[in-house]
Amino acid sequence: MMRSGRRGHLKQVATLGMGSLLPSSLFFHEILSYTKSQRMTQQNSPFYHFRIGAIEATVISDGQTLFPPHPLYAVNTTGEEVINALESHFLPTDLYRLQCNTLFLAMGNEKVLIDTGAGNTLGPGMGHLILHMSKAGIAPKSISTILITHCHLDHIGGLMHEGKPLFPNATLYISEQELNFWQAKNIDLNSMPIEESFKTNFKKAFHDNILPLNDRINTFRFNEEIVPGIQAIETTGHSPGHTSYWIRSGSDSLLHTGDIFHHPAFDLEHPSWATAFDQDPPKAYKTRRKILDMASFERVPVMSYHMPFPALGHIFARGNHYGWESAPWIL
């Protein structure tokens, strides 16, 4: 179902200079300072209840942080194109509002959480998962299973706090490919055009949040059913073992896509645009096009971790571009 015109997009992705670093204005500590300088107040509910067949599901926000939008989330295009994309979506052109949204699934005796937020790794706007779970009436100790899409810091940073597990009764599931990459003696992040201190924070997040839970980790291979009703789908490229999850109950389903795409104005509408955090940009692009084609053609309900809250919707195709139809808010 891959659409025509992708060769030109692949060429654009392939020309990305992986050896170059982002401008010094995007150094990690300055990103955090940028976040702190912005107004980051919560105005609305941080959780959203819905159903997938017999499954009681809840999207829970971990919070948000702010980044300069270019080139971090559109490395291989121009600042002018990014401004045009943001303006076409009626969005500010001087900042990118990155949201993190976890998914809780009540499946009988199984209480499943997909990803855990950023914890303390991305400044004060993030790391609110536990607080927001309590507002939704969900106890961390009730979580029996945690599914990790990939081991980037904004997905695993909420596993531990001050050396103690925040989900004391949970078993973790991580793809075998992903865990093998991050457990290597020398973790190779050279393909990511970000400053070295940012790479160090990625490695530290894995060391602080995954390694202490080693005796609770189970690995899986792609296409396996992790728990009844949830299947692991290979969507590698953004990370070496990036996993999406098919969630099925009766005739209903939801595809959790993790970080295949990040924002309607960027790598959804322009799937060839790579982020600085794509570890294999050409492969990430191929995966993105494959999943976007499938989701739009089959009209599959989707949850995407970084999409604007509640991060639920449908993908529709517009030639070589795609759009996002957000799920209607249900009171």
Label every model-predicted segment.
Residues 127, 134-138, 142, 176-234, ...:
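Metallo-beta-lactamase
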Residues 250-331:
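Cap/insert and terminal regions of metallo-dependent hydrolase folds
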Residues 24-59:
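C-terminal segment of N-terminal export signals and the immediately downstream linker at the start
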